[in-house]
Regions:
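N-terminal beta-strand motif that seeds the catalytic metal site of vicinal oxygen chelate
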Residues: 1-23, 68, 72, 115-127
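A generic structural signal for short, solvent-exposed coil/turn residues
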Residues: 2-4, 24-26, 40, 49-51, ...
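Extracytoplasmic/periplasmic beta-strand context in beta-sandwich domains
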Residues: 8, 44-46, 99
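Vicinal oxygen chelate
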Residues: 16, 52, 65-66, 70-108
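Amphipathic alpha-helical segments
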Residues: 17-33, 80-86
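Conserved short beta-strand elements that form part of the metal-binding/catalytic scaffold
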Residues: 30-68, 108-116
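Positions that flank functional sites
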Residues: 41-42, 99-100, 121
Length: 127
């Protein structure tokens, strides 16, 4: 079945109890104003605004060492995971509403649901 995907986000994973302080640093470092702040039972996110159309940059509080990861959005997350597995990636697990994947190089990334397919750059079409 054909599906579409594209790069959607750059996520700065922060192993810290002070995510807003980290957001202030990255806001000033990147010249992007701090946006929305979302706190859940087990998660915390802060967005940065003013990025290129269709690309989000945000910070996420994590319990693992700090790093950066990419989000790839797809209209069919399972099909995209299978496509990337065929390229050598492996599924780490399903978390909330996305796949956590690992590239052959060891880099982790996520496959998230494509929310706004008509905004931003056109997605790649895969068959």
């Amino acid at each position: 079945m054909a599906h579409r995907s594209r790069l959607s986000g750059l996520i700065i994973d922060c192993e810290t109890g002070e995510l807003l302080s980290a957001a202030t640093f990255w806001s000033q470092a990147l010249g992007l104003p701090v946006g929305g702040h979302e706190v859940g039972e087990t998660s915390e996110y802060v967005g940065l605004e003013g990025t290129a159309a269709g690309l989000s940059v945000g910070l996420q509080r994590v319990t693992h060492p700090s790093r950066v990861h990419l989000d790839i959005e797809a209209d069919d997350q399972d099909a995209e995971a299978a496509r990337l597995e065929a390229l050598g990636a492996r599924r780490i697990g399903w978390v909330k509403r996305w796949w956590v994947m690992e590239a052959p190089t060891g880099h982790r990334f996520c496959i998230v649901k494509m929310d706004k397919p008509d905004e931003g750059p056109p997605p790649n079409a895969w068959t």
